Amino acid sequence: MEIPVIEPLFTKVTEDIPGAEGPVFDKNGDFYIVAPEVEVNGKPAGEILRIDLKTGKKTVICKPEVNGYGGIPAGCQCDRDANQLFVADMRLGLLVVQTDGTFEEIAKKDSEGRRMQGCNDCAFDYEGNLWITAPAGEVAPADYTRSMQEKFGSIYCFTTDGQMIQVDTAFQFPNGIAVRHMNDGRPYQLIVAETPTKKLWSYDIKGPAKIENKKVWGHIPGTHEGGADGMDFDEDNNLLVANWGSSHIEVFGPDGGQPKMRIRCPFEKPSNLHFKPQTKTIFVTEHENNAVWKFEWQRNGKKQYCETLKFGIF
């Protein structure tokens, strides 16, 4: 059966953001993205930016650097209890970035004493645990490597008690990540994109940093170079997935499998997407024009952790 394709109206918000990624809103409604591909003298010098959505004006708030090593920030989430950003960085691991631009590197090692790997994307569950993909090798000062060919990508959970726990490994470039919740707010399913294989994997969440029953949950269409990147749930638990290199965003029903709908984009390489809180408006980053766009979806987005009051109360 042919998958239906829709073509909503996309509006460009801003452009010229090298490697545009990680769209996120903070609790004040301010919008942030990251520019992972900025370099200085051929070395990583990624940036975290605030975007004025009315004018498109870009303001760099942070250029993370640790011991002379610049960052490659790639994914963002906003905290609930403090208006701060958690940033997955391919060179520096996990960062906490304040809206004034100050930042902290969270962990050099995981709970087992292993050197932390470089991170790409992250998603909070409603209990406040942060689930993270880590497709890079060890953080700086180790040489920069990525798991595009060798399967050394990992998944971490940064728990509410401050532990950085590796929950699985042996992935070929794990990328986008999302958490599905029960109606009462309990997290119960973790979805992880494995870009080169065009697979979406799922796990059952049994508690903080506790997962089991790994299986293929969904398949990304196409034979192009690329695959699943960033993703977000709408309020009906449809999962919208940026299919990098295909000019489409794939829409999966709650049971996964094949997409039930495709959204055609006016650009080839969508990298991530994020709902504006309590609206149908989706902001999309992409790598053809290094730009941010927006369009209207059929439903509101699922509440983010930063929009909840406390666990179980919405």
From Swiss-Prot:
Q: What is the effect of changing D232S?
A: 3% increase in activity. 19% decrease in activity
Please tell me, according to the UniProt entry, what happens when changing Q304W: 3% decrease in activity
Query: What outcome is documented for mutating T195L in this protein?
Result: 11% decrease in activity
Q: What is the effect of changing F314A?
A: 3% increase in activity
Per the record, what is the consequence of mutating H248N? 4% increase in activity
Which residues bind Ca(2+) 2 per the record?
Answer: D232, L273, H274
**Reactions that this protein is recorded to catalyse:** diisopropyl fluorophosphate + H2O = diisopropyl phosphate + fluoride + 2 H(+)
Q: Does the keyword Transport apply?
A: no
Tell me what the record says about temperature and activity. Answer: Optimum temperature is 35 degrees Celsius.
The record gives the effect of mutating W244H as: 27% decrease in activity
Outcome of substituting D121F: 100% decrease in activity
Phenotype when changing H181N: 20% decrease in activity
Question: What's the reported outcome of changing H219N?
Answer: 3% increase in activity
What does changing Q77F do? 100% decrease in activity
Q: How does activity depend on pH?
A: Optimum pH is 8.0.
Record carries keyword Transcription: no
Alphabetically list the UniProt keywords.
Answer: Calcium, Hydrolase, Metal-binding
EC number(s) from the headed UniProt entry: 3.8.2.2
Which residues are Ca(2+) 1-binding? E21, N120, N175, D229
Variant or mutagenesis effect after changing F173V: 46% decrease in activity
Tell me which cofactor or cofactors this protein depends on. Answer: Ca(2+)
What is the annotated quaternary arrangement, including any partners?
Answer: Monomer.
Question: What role does it play?
Answer: Biological function and substrate unknown. However, it is capable of acting on phosphorus anhydride bonds (such as phosphorus-halide and phosphorus-cyanide) in organophosphorus compounds (including nerve gases).
Protein name as annotated: Diisopropyl-fluorophosphatase
